């Protein structure tokens, strides 16, 4: 039916006859000649229908409306000089229609305009309900084609240049919770027993290392029943990788080359290698975050030792309870940030309180290095402490110093949030800049206050640092995250590959030997049969593509995403099912209460 895609026709095809198919993006009637913008996934091209050349086709063109599906046969011609459109890849040419076939029209009025000429925003709920229309729009088509190019680049690099093998792992597996709730699938054949959809291919890819497939990768579908945010979905896609006989350094270097390859092929950008690195401790101390956006400054300064003996009880009291005091120095903050914004009711106070802060303290640096404030800080600092504060923060006249005092977790969350908000508001973030860095040496465990136990910071299969093996509770993990402009886009580690070490880690997180054997016995047994040292990484593919596409939500780079309420508006899922189906599965449903 067609010889070319719309966006493929160019000046090299002048005088050729082509067959094109697609949707009418826009129709314009100019003095008896009708112009149609024909669109397919490759782009737009202008069609000219002249009644003097083809009266029958002109009649059809007169009845055509936006989003009609048509087939065009016509001759490629150069546009008149005054009609050239340099903004359009096909802007040098147009097609004089010899024949127009109407393949399909519209049975209903469009719920929103699809045309590339439309700039009016459409509600996301409407876009998701009519996703097939939304995906015709230029922006969404561009995003999905970008996603395709990213995956194509991944496969080419890993297979052609690095000798990786793509292997699929099971979708129906056993429930081995890894931090989030599992999606469960009842077994009809085994009444009372359940499969789970995988949160990741973690266990199976480690089994593949035992099996001798030393370089594995997979574009893997993963499922987590968790509360949703802008960058989370109940089902998502990972680039999953695992490698045997490689050190952490070798894994990081290989992945830097992979990411650089993707950027070069997809964006035409050459990334400098190697990527910068921060330890977890350095990242938390300087930025208050393990995924810092380092495109701008505003680094935090710990002043706990300076404030522990101050007369300001908010600070000294927090330190006495084992907390810390940190300050966020803001150049030009005196003029840019008013007192009202920092006090209760102000926008910065609200931002801080959302992450647990009880309040904010601040001082302003005036001419001559004079510290000015409303409150008790100034009056409870000695001249020596004031001078040391100015020295540590490198504060100059015009600086605003924002303080947070509480437990370390709350302080870091508070100042991390404020750093990002203020950096954005003051225009300090270069939106065109690309910042990639590794964060390494994470703690093995973190304390779960609700359950009063240790839990793995990443997952319990992460290998401890060899220097810390005798004290697992405070051990560093041989783990690493890749951070892209303040987003974690990849995370991995060297793995435990000895049964006794794995059992010690299970014990540290409160798993009994029986429970560990019940959940992970097949992995522990595999470790008895010559397991090689191995490690890996998984990338959040949706998030990576989101950042490459300069979008704000992963829903805009997924063909058929769920809403933040975990619903598919297109298919109206999830839905109730027939009682007969439930009976076959040996499952009964507890109906939700009617309001």
UniProtKB/Swiss-Prot annotation:
It comes from the Bacteria. InterPro entries: Aa-tRNA-synt_II, aa-tRNA-synth_II, aa-tRNA-synth_II/BPL/LPL, Asp-tRNA-ligase_1, Asp-tRNA-ligase_1_N, Asp/Asn-tRNA-synth_IIb, AspRS_core, GAD-like_sf. L-aspartate binds at residues 178, 224, 458, 495. Keywords: Aminoacyl-tRNA synthetase, ATP-binding, Cytoplasm, Ligase, Nucleotide-binding, Protein biosynthesis. It is found in: Cytoplasm. GO terms for molecular function: aspartate-tRNA ligase activity; aspartate-tRNA(Asn) ligase activity; ATP binding; nucleic acid binding. Its main location: cytoplasm. PROSITE patterns: AA_TRNA_LIGASE_II (PS50862). Its EC number is 6.1.1.23. The record marks 30 as: Important for tRNA non-discrimination. It catalyses: tRNA(Asx) + L-aspartate + ATP = L-aspartyl-tRNA(Asx) + AMP + diphosphate. Residues 202-205 are annotated as: Aspartate. SUPFAM superfamilies: Class II aaRS and biotin synthetases, GAD domain-like, Nucleic acid-binding proteins. GO terms for biological process: aspartyl-tRNA aminoacylation. Gene3D superfamilies: Bira Bifunctional Protein, Domain 2 (3.30.930.10), GAD-like domain (3.30.1360.30), Nucleic acid-binding proteins (2.40.50.140). It is an enzyme of class 6 (ligase). ATP binds at residues 224-226, 233, 488, 540-543. Aspartyl-tRNA synthetase with relaxed tRNA specificity since it is able to aspartylate not only its cognate tRNA(Asp) but also tRNA(Asn). Reaction proceeds in two steps: L-aspartate is first activated by ATP to form Asp-AMP and then transferred to the acceptor end of tRNA(Asp/Asn). PANTHER family: ASPARTATE--TRNA LIGASE, MITOCHONDRIAL, ASPARTYL/LYSYL-TRNA SYNTHETASE. Belongs to the class-II aminoacyl-tRNA synthetase family. Type 1 subfamily. Homodimer. This is Aspartate--tRNA(Asp/Asn) ligase. It comes from Trichodesmium erythraeum (strain IMS101).
